[in-house]
Amino acid sequence: MLDAFSRAVVSADSKTAPIGGDDLNQLRSFIASGNRRLDAVNAIASNASCMVSDAVAGMICENTGLIQAGGNCYPNRRMAACLRDAEIILRYVSYALLAGDASVLDDRCLNGLKETYTALGVPLQSTARAVAIMKAQAAAHIQDNPSEALAGAKLRKMGTPVVEDRCASLVAESSSYFDRVIAALS
């Protein structure tokens, strides 16, 4: 797993040159976005339980066969495993967002995920749909505009007014991590 700083060092070392130019500008940008990045990860982490349960519920609403006898979310232990897996995926996406690098997601979460799910008979399309729901929720939480009418008292906002332009890059970055998960399941 490499963070932005480690990547810059490895890149400079491979060129046998000091860190400078574009690498230095990228590091400055990464540092400048640090507080927003922390706020974005906090927004996801603070709402993770609701995000996971809503994503799995949405997946089940679209495919009710999952909770029928013989479905992948029946009985309770399989439902618990589904919720656990969705939480793990969301956690690794937040790690990648915090580090500004997808390697932790690739190495520790996505490596072999499709093969494991296929061997266990987990429906990949339904899992990808749950991830897509979490992607939309994460974007809403990062932009600090989730629907309070739908979330009710469980909703935790970031607490600071957010200008959408400032968070557009973080929304795009987090979306790219969710897209990696969806692609790994395809």
Curated annotation (Swiss-Prot):
Record-listed (2R,3E)-phycoerythrobilin 3 binding positions: C167
Pfam families associated with the record: Phycobilisome
Gene name tied to this protein: cpeB
Sites bearing N4-methylasparagine, chain numbering: N72
Signal peptide: none
Taxonomy of the source species: Bacteria, Bacillati, Cyanobacteriota, Cyanophyceae, Oscillatoriophycideae
Family: Belongs to the phycobiliprotein family.
Cellular compartment(s): Cellular thylakoid membrane
Post-translational modification as stated in the protein's UniProt record: Contains three covalently linked bilin chromophores.
Residues noted as binding (2R,3E)-phycoerythrobilin 1 in the record, renumbered to the chain: C50, C61
Biological process according to GO: photosynthesis
GO cellular component entries: phycobilisome; plasma membrane-derived thylakoid membrane
The keyword Transport is assigned to this record: yes
Superkingdom to which the source organism belongs: Bacteria
Keyword match Thylakoid: yes
Keywords: Antenna complex, Bile pigment, Chromophore, Electron transport, Membrane, Methylation, Photosynthesis, Phycobilisome, Thylakoid, Transport
Main location, first listed in the record: membrane
Protein name as annotated: C-phycoerythrin beta chain
Assembly mode: Heterodimer of an alpha and a beta chain.
Protein species of origin: Synechocystis sp. (strain PCC 6701)
Membrane topology term: Peripheral membrane protein
Amino acids binding (2R,3E)-phycoerythrobilin 2: C82
Described purpose of this protein according to its UniProt entry: Light-harvesting photosynthetic bile pigment-protein from the phycobiliprotein complex.
